[in-house]
Each structure stands twice: as C-alpha cells, then as structure tokens.
C-alpha cells in the first residue's frame, strides 16, 4: 500500500490537555482553527513525519501508524445511506481532515519491531480520556526510521476500512469537492494534499471487534491552502 509521512496540524505539546476538550470550537471552522494556531494552542509541523499511535485500556493495547494514503483507500466500505454532502462540505471548508480514518492491514512481524523501537523514545503526547483510555503518540522524523516504516508499508497489502462508513464517504466527497474547485480554477495538478487522507493503520491481528480511533484534533491533515 501507499502510506506516506505528512506535515501535521496538532495541539501544542504543552497545551494538549487544554486543546482536546476544546476541539469542537477549534475545528468549527477555518477561522477558528487559524485563530488557535495564531494563539499557539495548535501548531503546524513544518516537516513530514509518521506518527506511532498507541491506545491502551479495555480491552487491551493496540499500536498503529498514522500516515497519509490515497483517498481511494477509503472507498469500498459498506454502502452509506446517509447524505454525507453537508459533512463533506464542512471538511472542505475547514480545509483540514479532523481525525485519521481507521484502517486495518496485514502487518509483518518486522513492523512490530520497528514500531517498538520508535516507542522507546519520549512520547509526544500521553493523555487519558474520560473513558479511561490512554492515548500515546510518538513522532517519527529520523530519515532511517521513516525509510524503514515506509518500506514495510510499501510491502503490505491494501488496507481495509474499519471506521464509520459515513465518515469515510464524507472524506472522499470532500476530496472531490476540492478537486472540482481546483479544476474550475484551472490549477489542478493531481498532487494536491486533498488527494490523500490521513489514516491510522492498525494490524488486523491486534483489532478485535471495534478498532481504535484517534481522538479528533490530535493528529490532523491540512487538505487545502489556508
């Protein structure tokens, strides 16, 4: 599969406990998000990185990689009866994907070793939500570590959607809306960030029942220019 490192918009490390409960207002619109960035509550990472995400609690612990995948990876879920146009337009107007979509894939044992090594460093975040689930994030920017993760993901088969199909459909539709706007403006190249969706990729063997979900606003992906 194709899964790449990306520049993330995320809470400032020392203000994450302030930011997460306020995500409803921070992500209510592009102006609010830009205000949070100007205030230092949120930050735009200058460089691309993978993020190792771990959640632990009941019923156990799962570890995944957060990366950007071609938006087509979100297709093929269950048929969506709900109209997702309003949600898609909100994402397109926000210009940011508010949380990673959850995907599962067949991981090799080598990937466990690589991610285990990444988790030996200091974590970027370690927060426990009201449900008692602890969310930890490690940033992977070192060239050799990024290369190792990318090589393993390149060899993995295509992932499967393990998220709300309506959310995935809204992300796909938002991508189409932004592409239509770019085509109408004569600026479309095919390389725009809206052609990718940020995803949390979990090994299928670790996921039983409901897959883990990265909290909204913790790791977001800018899909259009502010």
Give residue ranges: language-model regions.
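Surface-exposed, charge/polar-rich loops and edge strands
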Residues: 1-161, 165-226
């Amino acid at each position: 599969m194709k899964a790449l490192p990306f520049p993330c918009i995320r809470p400032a490390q020392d203000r994450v406990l302030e930011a997460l409960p306020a995500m409803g207002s921070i992500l209510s619109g592009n102006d609010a998000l830009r205000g949070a960035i100007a205030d230092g509550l949120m930050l735009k990472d200058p460089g691309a990185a993978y993020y190792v995400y771990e959640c632990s609690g009941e019923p156990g612990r799962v570890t995944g990689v957060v990366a950007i995948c071609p938006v087509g990876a979100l297709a093929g879920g269950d048929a969506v009866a709900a109209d997702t146009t309003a949600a898609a337009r909100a994402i397109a107007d926000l210009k940011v994907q508010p949380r990673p979509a959850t995907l599962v894939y067949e991981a090799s044992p080598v990937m466990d070793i690589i991610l285990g090594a990444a988790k030996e460093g200091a974590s970027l975040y370690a927060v426990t939500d009201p449900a008692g689930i602890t969310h930890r994030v490690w940033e992977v920017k070192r060239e050799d570590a990024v290369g190792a993760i990318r090589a393993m993901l390149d060899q993995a088969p295509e992932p499967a959607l393990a998220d709300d199909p309506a959310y995935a459909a809204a992300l796909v539709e938002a991508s189409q809306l932004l592409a239509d706007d770019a085509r109408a403006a004569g600026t479309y190249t095919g390389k725009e960030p809206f052609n990718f969706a940020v995803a949390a990729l979990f090994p299928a063997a670790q996921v039983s029942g409901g897959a883990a979900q990265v909290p909204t606003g913790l790791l977001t992906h800018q899909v259009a220019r502010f």
